[in-house]
From Swiss-Prot:
Belongs to the UPF0208 family. This is UPF0208 membrane protein SO_2914. The chain crosses the membrane at residues 40-60, 68-88. The keyword Cell membrane applies. It is found in: Cell inner membrane. It comes from Shewanella oneidensis (strain ATCC 700550 / JCM 31522 / CIP 106686 / LMG 19005 / NCIMB 14063 / MR-1). It comes from the Bacteria.
Amino acid sequence: MSINILKTLGDGRRYMKTWPMVRQLGLYFPEYRVVRATQLAILVMPVLAVLASVSQLYTYGWAFLPQALTIALFFISLPLQGLLWLGWRARHPLPLSLFDWSNQLSAKLTAMGIHCQSLGAKACYLDMALILKIAFERLDASYWEEL
């Protein structure tokens, strides 16, 4: 079980780095907001965990050490929850509508001479993110304004 959780966290980290951070995709996919929130949480939550724990220990003394540790663990768990969701989403199979749209995008990239793998039968959101990342790097902005 713990290996599966670590694999899911790793998948979430990879998916977070792969997903193109383009505002237009935020209208269609929740990943844009989740990735932004998780990146912010990775930076801010450890500091908030230390501040909350230290302030509670300073105010109430060592008798409140269990409560201070609980608060610290809560703050530290927030970015992990984002990574777990992203990891779950990365391996989640694509719906047929997104599968067709991703295959059309892949075909358009291949027609332009850009090496891009078409999606297989077990395509997942991570595969779509790879295609989207290549597409946003190579296609002009007029294509994305049509969305």
